A protein has these predicted regions:
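Amphipathic alpha-helical segments of tetratricopeptide repeats
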Residues: 25-26, 59-63, 93-100, 104, ...
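Residue signature of alpha-solenoid helical repeat architecture, marking inter-repeat boundaries
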Residues: 32, 66, 102, 106, ...
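Structural motif corresponding to the intra-repeat A-B loop/turn of tetratricopeptide repeats
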Residues: 11, 48, 82, 102, ...
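TPR/TPR-like alpha-solenoid signature
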Residues: 2, 39, 73, 109, ...
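Residue register of alpha-helical TPR repeats
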Residues: 36, 70, 110, 139-142, ...
């Protein structure tokens, strides 16, 4: 049955997402439908760090009824924002149980994906992948992209670049097949390139990141991370002038309050220019 609300999301533009959800709220004709939309407005407030507003919207959704799994899922995400170890685990488990009981595999896999982040990573990832891979519903299969992406970054951070590459390739294949959002596809390609460079395959990494930038240019999208990775690729290939060019562009697109070590590395690649 898919997730009818997912197309309204743009996580890079919460304000526009909120406008779409508020417009959708006016179109809903049932309490259950309104409750579903309210949970997504609550998620937006949670992402903004406005937790009291998030809680109020979830309470409102819960009072309407009919969206219990979504309410628990978003309560879990809100709890996870506290940063406490294991925060959200109980809510995500409840959301998973509710979604499975109601036959909502989209929300069940979403909950399992969150449980893989806060709980037993391997067990919940395996369960979620099994559910998503065997599904006929593209709304369920969509979750293979985020799941493989999470596996890839976990392996990458553990120093397993080869394992990360395998997972990132699966994530990219899933994005190309099941996710209509081109930016998410290019983010998956970006990760593939990053793992390739970590394996000493900088020429292949550069080709991947050049493809990311070609899409961005055609779409009118500016992304400093694409330029940053290409600068690293070119530096590894001793293409110093090209590395400087892309490092400078990445610096132009990087906020002054960004991670200081990242800025220092970009300045080094750019030839220590003034910002």
């Amino acid at each position: 049955m898919g997730d009818r609300l997912r197309p309204l999301w743009d996580f890079s533009d919460l304000d526009s997402s909120e406008l779409r959800f508020r417009a959708q709220l006016e179109l809903e004709t049932t309490d259950a439908g309104r409750a579903e939309v309210l949970t997504q407005l609550a998620r937006i407030e949670g992402l903004r760090g406005r937790f009291e507003r998030c809680d109020a919207l979830l309470d409102e959704a819960e009072a309407l009824g009919g969206a219990e799994a979504r309410v628990e899922l978003e309560r879990g995400r809100r709890e996870r924002s506290s940063g406490r170890p294991g925060a959200g685990l109980t809510e995500f488990e409840h959301a998973f149980q509710l979604a499975r009981a109601s036959g909502d595999d989209v929300l069940a896999v979403d909950a399992a994906h969150m449980l893989a982040i806060v709980g037993d990573t391997e067990a919940w990832t395996a369960r979620a992948v099994e559910m998503a891979a065997s599904a006929d519903d593209p709304g369920v299969r969509y979750w293979l992209g985020p799941l493989y992406n999470n596996v890839g970054w976990s392996r990458y951070e553990d120093g397993d670049a080869a394992g990360a590459l395998d997972a990132f390739k699966l994530a990219l294949a899933s994005r190309e097949r099941d996710d209509p959002r081109p930016y998410e596809r290019e983010i998956a390609r970006y990760a593939v390139g990053k793992a390739l460079r970590a394996l000493g395959r900088a020429d292949e990494a550069a080709a991947a990141h050049e493809e990311c930038l070609a899409w961005a240019a055609a779409a009118g999208v500016e992304d400093g991370y694409f330029h940053e990775e290409l600068a690293e690729d070119y530096a590894a290939l001793s293409r110093d002038a090209d590395a400087r060019e892309h490092a400078r562009r990445a610096l132009e697109l990087t906020p002054d309050d960004d991670d200081s070590s990242r800025i220092a590395r970009l300045r080094s690649l750019a030839g220590d220019i003034d910002r």
